[in-house]
Protein backbone atom coordinates (compact mmCIF):
# COMPACT_ATOMS: atom_id res chain seq x y z
CA UNK A 1 0.00 0.00 0.00
CA UNK A 2 1.37 3.34 -1.00
CA UNK A 3 0.98 6.26 1.36
CA UNK A 4 0.57 9.54 -0.43
CA UNK A 5 1.96 12.59 1.23
CA UNK A 6 0.35 15.92 0.55
CA UNK A 7 2.98 17.85 -1.35
CA UNK A 8 1.55 21.15 -0.18
CA UNK A 9 1.75 20.09 3.46
CA UNK A 10 5.27 18.72 2.99
CA UNK A 11 6.37 21.91 1.30
CA UNK A 12 4.92 23.96 4.12
CA UNK A 13 6.75 21.85 6.69
CA UNK A 14 10.08 22.36 4.96
CA UNK A 15 9.47 26.08 4.77
CA UNK A 16 8.68 26.17 8.49
CA UNK A 17 11.92 24.37 9.25
CA UNK A 18 14.12 26.55 7.08
CA UNK A 19 12.36 29.81 8.00
CA UNK A 20 14.23 31.76 10.70
CA UNK A 21 12.39 31.78 14.00
CA UNK A 22 12.59 35.54 14.41
CA UNK A 23 11.04 36.02 11.00
CA UNK A 24 7.68 34.97 12.42
CA UNK A 25 7.56 38.16 14.47
CA UNK A 26 9.44 40.99 12.86
CA UNK A 27 8.52 43.31 15.71
CA UNK A 28 10.41 41.22 18.29
CA UNK A 29 13.73 43.13 17.91
CA UNK A 30 11.91 46.26 19.03
CA UNK A 31 11.89 44.83 22.54
CA UNK A 32 15.67 44.90 22.53
CA UNK A 33 15.89 48.49 21.37
CA UNK A 34 16.68 51.26 23.79
CA UNK A 35 16.34 54.97 23.33
CA UNK A 36 19.22 57.39 23.71
CA UNK A 37 17.75 58.41 27.05
CA UNK A 38 17.83 54.84 28.38
CA UNK A 39 21.43 54.44 27.24
CA UNK A 40 22.34 57.70 28.93
CA UNK A 41 20.66 56.56 32.13
CA UNK A 42 22.60 53.30 32.13
CA UNK A 43 25.89 55.11 31.73
CA UNK A 44 24.99 57.77 34.26
CA UNK A 45 24.09 55.22 36.95
CA UNK A 46 27.80 54.36 37.01
CA UNK A 47 28.68 58.05 36.97
CA UNK A 48 26.28 58.74 39.83
CA UNK A 49 27.82 55.95 41.88
CA UNK A 50 31.21 57.58 41.31
CA UNK A 51 29.87 61.05 42.10
CA UNK A 52 28.33 59.74 45.32
CA UNK A 53 31.90 59.18 46.51
CA UNK A 54 32.36 62.95 46.29
CA UNK A 55 29.55 63.44 48.80
CA UNK A 56 29.60 62.80 52.56
CA UNK A 57 29.08 59.07 53.00
CA UNK A 58 26.72 59.39 55.95
CA UNK A 59 24.50 61.88 54.13
CA UNK A 60 24.07 59.69 51.05
CA UNK A 61 23.39 56.57 53.13
CA UNK A 62 20.87 58.43 55.28
CA UNK A 63 18.98 59.65 52.22
CA UNK A 64 18.97 56.24 50.53
CA UNK A 65 17.77 54.59 53.74
CA UNK A 66 15.07 57.09 54.68
CA UNK A 67 13.78 58.02 51.23
CA UNK A 68 11.58 54.92 50.71
CA UNK A 69 10.29 55.23 54.29
CA UNK A 70 9.48 58.93 54.28
CA UNK A 71 8.01 58.84 50.75
CA UNK A 72 5.94 55.72 51.45
CA UNK A 73 7.55 53.98 48.50
CA UNK A 74 6.79 56.91 46.21
CA UNK A 75 3.07 56.97 47.08
CA UNK A 76 3.05 60.30 48.89
CA UNK A 77 0.22 62.02 50.68
CA UNK A 78 0.62 65.53 52.11
CA UNK A 79 2.47 64.35 55.24
CA UNK A 80 4.81 62.07 53.27
CA UNK A 81 5.60 64.87 50.82
CA UNK A 82 6.47 67.24 53.68
CA UNK A 83 8.68 64.61 55.31
CA UNK A 84 10.43 63.83 52.03
CA UNK A 85 10.96 67.53 51.30
CA UNK A 86 12.45 67.99 54.76
CA UNK A 87 14.75 65.00 54.23
CA UNK A 88 15.99 66.39 50.89
CA UNK A 89 16.54 69.85 52.41
CA UNK A 90 18.47 68.53 55.43
CA UNK A 91 20.64 66.19 53.36
CA UNK A 92 21.30 68.92 50.80
CA UNK A 93 22.33 71.36 53.52
CA UNK A 94 24.55 68.67 55.02
CA UNK A 95 26.33 68.14 51.68
CA UNK A 96 26.83 71.89 51.37
CA UNK A 97 28.12 72.68 54.86
CA UNK A 98 30.30 69.56 55.18
CA UNK A 99 32.26 70.73 52.14
CA UNK A 100 33.83 73.33 54.44
CA UNK A 101 34.99 70.79 57.03
CA UNK A 102 38.47 69.33 57.22
CA UNK A 103 40.50 67.05 59.46
CA UNK A 104 43.78 67.43 61.28
CA UNK A 105 45.96 64.78 62.89
CA UNK A 106 47.86 65.94 65.94
CA UNK A 107 51.21 64.64 67.23
CA UNK A 108 49.45 61.88 69.18
CA UNK A 109 47.71 60.63 66.05
CA UNK A 110 44.29 61.88 67.15
CA UNK A 111 42.00 62.99 64.33
CA UNK A 112 40.43 66.38 64.96
CA UNK A 113 37.62 67.68 62.80
CA UNK A 114 37.04 71.34 62.21
CA UNK A 115 35.40 73.98 60.08
CA UNK A 116 37.28 76.27 57.72
CA UNK A 117 36.71 79.96 58.42
CA UNK A 118 37.99 83.19 56.89
CA UNK A 119 40.49 83.43 59.76
CA UNK A 120 41.72 79.86 59.82
CA UNK A 121 40.56 76.51 61.19
CA UNK A 122 38.05 76.08 64.00
CA UNK A 123 38.21 72.73 65.82
CA UNK A 124 34.61 71.69 66.42
CA UNK A 125 35.02 69.95 69.77
CA UNK A 126 37.55 72.49 71.03
CA UNK A 127 39.95 69.75 72.09
CA UNK A 128 42.95 71.61 70.71
CA UNK A 129 43.98 74.89 69.15
CA UNK A 130 46.16 75.06 66.08
CA UNK A 131 49.07 77.50 65.87
CA UNK A 132 48.15 80.55 63.83
CA UNK A 133 50.56 79.75 60.99
CA UNK A 134 49.19 76.20 60.68
CA UNK A 135 45.60 77.34 61.06
CA UNK A 136 45.92 79.72 58.11
CA UNK A 137 46.63 76.77 55.81
CA UNK A 138 43.06 75.60 56.40
CA UNK A 139 41.32 78.94 55.98
CA UNK A 140 38.32 79.38 53.72
CA UNK A 141 39.00 79.75 50.00
CA UNK A 142 36.88 80.53 46.97
CA UNK A 143 37.27 76.99 45.63
CA UNK A 144 35.52 75.71 48.77
CA UNK A 145 32.34 77.49 47.71
CA UNK A 146 32.65 75.98 44.24
CA UNK A 147 32.93 72.50 45.74
CA UNK A 148 30.03 73.21 48.11
CA UNK A 149 27.66 74.23 45.33
CA UNK A 150 28.80 71.39 43.09
CA UNK A 151 28.17 68.94 45.94
CA UNK A 152 24.68 70.39 46.20
CA UNK A 153 24.12 69.87 42.48
CA UNK A 154 25.46 66.31 42.65
CA UNK A 155 23.11 65.53 45.52
CA UNK A 156 20.28 66.95 43.43
CA UNK A 157 21.21 64.49 40.67
CA UNK A 158 21.19 61.64 43.20
CA UNK A 159 17.70 62.71 44.30
CA UNK A 160 16.45 62.73 40.69
CA UNK A 161 17.73 59.19 40.24
CA UNK A 162 15.79 58.05 43.31
CA UNK A 163 12.48 56.72 41.99
CA UNK A 164 10.76 57.09 45.37
CA UNK A 165 11.52 60.80 45.57
CA UNK A 166 10.66 61.45 41.91
CA UNK A 167 7.34 59.60 42.16
CA UNK A 168 6.57 61.53 45.33
CA UNK A 169 7.13 64.99 43.86
CA UNK A 170 6.10 64.17 40.26
CA UNK A 171 3.50 61.38 40.40
CA UNK A 172 2.17 62.03 36.88
CA UNK A 173 4.76 64.02 34.91
CA UNK A 174 4.04 65.21 31.40
CA UNK A 175 6.15 64.03 28.49
CA UNK A 176 8.18 67.25 28.56
CA UNK A 177 8.70 67.04 32.33
CA UNK A 178 9.77 63.41 32.02
CA UNK A 179 12.40 64.37 29.45
CA UNK A 180 13.76 67.04 31.80
CA UNK A 181 13.77 64.66 34.79
CA UNK A 182 15.67 62.12 32.71
CA UNK A 183 18.18 64.38 30.98
CA UNK A 184 18.90 66.87 33.77
CA UNK A 185 20.77 64.51 36.14
CA UNK A 186 22.79 63.26 33.17
CA UNK A 187 23.97 66.78 32.39
CA UNK A 188 24.62 67.56 36.04
CA UNK A 189 26.62 64.37 36.44
CA UNK A 190 28.84 65.02 33.43
CA UNK A 191 29.36 68.70 34.24
CA UNK A 192 30.09 68.03 37.92
CA UNK A 193 32.52 65.22 37.20
CA UNK A 194 34.45 67.50 34.85
CA UNK A 195 34.68 70.26 37.47
CA UNK A 196 35.68 67.90 40.28
CA UNK A 197 38.34 66.36 38.04
CA UNK A 198 39.64 69.79 37.01
CA UNK A 199 39.51 71.32 40.50
CA UNK A 200 39.86 68.44 42.98
CA UNK A 201 39.25 69.20 46.63
CA UNK A 202 42.14 69.02 49.08
CA UNK A 203 39.92 68.83 52.16
CA UNK A 204 39.14 65.65 54.06
CA UNK A 205 36.22 66.59 56.23
CA UNK A 206 33.43 64.80 58.03
CA UNK A 207 32.14 61.89 55.97
CA UNK A 208 35.21 61.87 53.73
CA UNK A 209 38.45 59.83 53.89
CA UNK A 210 40.69 60.78 56.80
CA UNK A 211 43.48 63.22 56.17
CA UNK A 212 47.11 62.20 56.43
CA UNK A 213 48.07 65.72 57.45
Curated annotation (Swiss-Prot):
Main localization, broad class: membrane
Location within or outside the cell: Vacuole membrane
InterPro entries: DMP
Keyword Disulfide bond: no
Signal peptide: none
GO cellular component: plant-type vacuole membrane
Keywords, in A-Z order: Membrane, Transmembrane, Transmembrane helix, Vacuole
Gene Ontology process terms (BP): abscission; endomembrane system organization; plant organ senescence
Tissue expression summary: Expressed in leaves, flowers and siliques, especially in vascular tissues.
Membrane topology, as annotated: Multi-pass membrane protein
TM region positions: 51-71, 78-98, 142-162, 180-200
Family to which this protein belongs: Belongs to the plant DMP1 protein family.
Known function: Involved in membrane remodeling.
Protein name as it appears in the record: Protein DMP4
Taxonomic placement: Eukaryota, Viridiplantae, Streptophyta, Embryophyta, Tracheophyta
Amino acid sequence: MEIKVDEGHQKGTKEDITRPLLEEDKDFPDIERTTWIQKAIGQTFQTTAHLANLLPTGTVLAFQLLSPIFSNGGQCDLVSKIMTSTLVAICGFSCFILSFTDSYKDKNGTICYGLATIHGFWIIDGSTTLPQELSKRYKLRFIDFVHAFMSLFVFGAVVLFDRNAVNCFFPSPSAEALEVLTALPVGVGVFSSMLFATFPTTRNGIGFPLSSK
